[in-house]
Each structure stands twice: as structure tokens, then as C-alpha cells.
UniProtKB/Swiss-Prot annotation:
GO cellular component, one term: cytosol
Listed NCBIfam families: L3_bact
UniProt source species: Escherichia coli (strain K12)
Keyword Isomerase listed: no
Sequence positions bearing N5-methylglutamine: 150
Protein name (database record): Large ribosomal subunit protein uL3
InterPro entries assigned: Ribosomal_uL3, Ribosomal_uL3_bac/org-type, Ribosomal_uL3_CS, Transl_B-barrel_sf
Length: 209
């Protein structure tokens, strides 16, 4: 089953009839318009390309304008692709709404996490700090040793060090679908999702549901 592209509106909470508070993230899922259908014969795989939202005319490049015009859809804020499963069929120009998730219980949400800039190992990797006193004067938050000896004589790939934190693609799996509001194009999922308010999200039926 394909997914949909939405926009993170923010977080709130809703109450059950028993008075239990559920923290939810509100995702606005405007109609996803199909701009291209890829098939085995021409592309080597089956998929659909979709767009959503709107883009100012002066921000649309000529190649983009031609692509959207050929599909007969309004220019959107980006292009995303979803692989098609056996038996799934879509046509160019078709509109897909949030009702796609009407019978879905859990979803996986992918977004770009908030960037935190250059961060040290304590913040980035939860390293323990070294002694505050006991003769330690300069190495309270340094990572410590990063290798061994003349053998192997190098720092291994993947060593946890200071560096850019956040601003990367993150997927949160198996979030409960609390409500699907087709009238207002809203999807409410339990818990937090990656990214800042207003950022794009890819919502798919959960792999591990």
C-alpha cells in the first residue's frame, strides 16, 4: 500500500470518553495529486510520483512547469515517489485523500529532524562526562580515547564523535492512528514525529503493524 505526503501542524491532546489524555501530532494531509506513473516496461519498477500543496508561479522552474502541465495538475511544493504493490493501480492526475488511512491502525512517519548544529559527544551520543574534580582540569566533557595503539593505527569508521546533530531523515515506526478527519484533511497520530512545525512528512501504513 502506498503512503501520503503531509505537513506537520503541531501537537495537542485529545481525551477519550474515560477522560484519558492522549498526546497527538496533527498532520495536515492535503490531496496528493499523481504526476507520473512508472511501470516495469519503461522504468524497471512500478511506482507513482505525487505532489501536494501549492507553489508560487514565480518559484516553478520551466522543467517543473512542463512536468506538471503534462500531468494536468497544479504545481505542488515538491515531488515524492511511492512504490506500488501488486494490484495497485493509479492514473496520472488522480487525487488521493487522507481517507486512504480510514482502515489503517498504525503508521510509520518519516521526516527531517530538527537541526541542532555542531554538538559534542555528551549531547550527541549521551557520553558520560569525566570527573568534575579529582585532578581533572580540562577534560570534563571531552570524549576520551578514540582508538587503540600502533595496531590498528587508525580510528575505526563509525566512531562516535562530535559533529552535526539532527537535520537528518528519521522514521518513527508503528504510531497509532487516533483519528482521520477527511473533512479537514487531518490525520491525528499518537505521540511525536520528527521535524519542525510546517515540515513535510511521509506517512505510510506501518511495516510492523
Amino acid at each position: 500500500m502506498i503512503g501520503l505526503v503531509g505537513k506537520k501542524v503541531g501537537m495537542t491532546r485529545i481525551f477519550t470518553e474515560d477522560g484519558v489524555s492522549i498526546p497527538v501530532t496533527v498532520i495536515e494531509v492535503e490531496a496528493n495529486r499523481v504526476t507520473q506513473v512508472k511501470d516495469l516496461a519503461n522504468d524497471g519498477y512500478r511506482a507513482i510520483q505525487v505532489t501536494t500543496g501549492a507553489k508560487k508561479a514565480n518559484r516553478v522552474t520551466k522543467p517543473e512547469a512542463g512536468h506538471f502541465a503534462k500531468a494536468g495538475v497544479e504545481a505542488g511544493r515538491g515531488l515524492w515517489e511511492f512504490r506500488l504493490a501488486e494490484g495497485e493501480e493509479f492514473t496520472v492526475g488522480q487525487s488521493i485523500s487522507v481517507e486512504l488511512f480510514a482502515d489503517v491502525k498504525k503508521v510509520d512517519v518519516t521526516g527531517t529532524s530538527k537541526g541542532k548544529g555542531f554538538a559534542g559527544t555528551v549531547k550527541r551520543w549521551n557520553f558520560r562526562t569525566q570527573d568534575a574534580t579529582h585532578g581533572n582540569s580540562l577534560s570534563h566533557r571531552v570524549p576520551g580515547s578514540i582508538g587503540q595503539n600502533q595496531t590498528p593505527g587508525k580510528v575505526f569508521k563509525g566512531k562516535k564523535m562530535a559533529g552535526q546533530m539532527g537535520n537528518e531523515r528519521v522514521t518513527v515506526q508503528s504510531l497509532d492512528v487516533v483519528r482521520v478527519d477527511a473533512e479537514r484533511n487531518l490525520l491525528l497520530v499518537k505521540g511525536a514525529v520528527p521535524g519542525a512545525t510546517g515540515s513535510d512528512l511521509i506517512v505510510k501504513p506501518a511495516v510492523k503493524a
